[in-house]
């Protein structure tokens, strides 16, 4: 998530990082080349015909409804992800506080290990949802923890497993009664649940039929739109197509 100042309109408008511009740039270039080619044909052969705008107005309304559904879906995924990240932070902090409440002050090394494992889990979840987990996210762990983690194919699950073992050892050390472990186990389950929920949001695609319908519909609409605009706007059609592609394809890419 990118932090920004909504009141600074100019900075938001001129921002590049985090926008959909990199995703739509290639599509925009191809559509402008297509529009330029049609302009050349119209000028070279001196074509004089007007398709009218009624059909494209009707198709545009239908396309807008499809894009509204896409926007609502994107916002729902964003909001659900934001809630899960909030739950991740709260659960991690609560687990750390509960751990410190049962581990004696004299066991600073054990306290540090538990805190490091919890912090590493949060970082692993973040990178798991991005480009993959690297050693940078695990540098806060001890060499023994990193070596133990090599036995697991999934670092986040491995960290939870190690955490469970370490916290269960508190029972053997008489630092907590067995019934108390249920609260810690519940927190570990919550951390696992957050990871699964974020995985679902990140990796569940939209239905293929919907994506296919939207992309084909948009390609036909934008591909034929210059034929409507050129007789009326001439070279200004290039500017009109720039904004049309940016608006429609940009919303579809969100």
What are these model-predicted stretches?
Residues 98-210:
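Structured inter-helical modules in multipass membrane proteins
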Residues 17-21, 151-152, 212:
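Solvent-exposed interaction patches of small proteins and small membrane subunits
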Residues 1-86, 105, 109, 231-238, ...:
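N-terminal juxtamembrane/topogenic regions of multi-pass membrane proteins
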Residues 120, 215-253:
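C-terminal, helix-dominated tail/subdomain
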Residues 74, 124, 225-226:
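Short, hydrophobic/aromatic alpha-helical segments in well-folded domains
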Residues 83-100, 246, 254:
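Membrane-cytosol interface motif
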């Amino acid at each position: 998530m990118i932090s920004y100042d909504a009141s600074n309109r100019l900075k938001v408008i001129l921002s590049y990082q985090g926008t959909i511009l990199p995703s739509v740039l290639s599509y925009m270039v191809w559509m402008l080349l297509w529009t330029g080619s049609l302009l050349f044909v119209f000028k070279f052969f001196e074509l004089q015909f007007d398709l009218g705008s009624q059909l494209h107005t009707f198709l545009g309304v239908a396309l807008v409804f499809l894009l509204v559904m896409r926007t609502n879906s994107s916002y729902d995924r964003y909001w659900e992800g934001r809630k899960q990240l909030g739950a991740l932070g709260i659960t991690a902090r609560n687990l750390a506080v509960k751990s410190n409440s049962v581990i004696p002050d004299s066991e600073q090394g054990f306290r540090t290990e538990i805190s490091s494992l919890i912090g590493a889990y949060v970082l692993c979840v973040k990178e798991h949802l991005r480009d993959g987990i690297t050693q940078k996210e695990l540098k806060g762990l001890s060499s023994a923890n990193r070596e133990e983690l090599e036995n697991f194919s999934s670092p986040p699950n491995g960290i939870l497993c190690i955490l469970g073992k370490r916290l269960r050892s508190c029972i053997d050390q008489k630092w907590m009664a067995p019934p108390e472990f249920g609260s810690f186990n519940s927190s570990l389950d919550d951390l696992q649940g957050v990871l699964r929920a974020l995985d679902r949001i990140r990796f569940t695609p939209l239905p293929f039929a919907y994506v296919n319908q939207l992309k084909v519909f948009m390609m036909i609409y934008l591909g034929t739109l210059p034929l409507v605009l050129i007789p009326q706007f001439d070279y200004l059609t290039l500017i009109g197509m720039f904004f049309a592609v940016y608006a429609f394809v940009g919303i579809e890419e969100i």
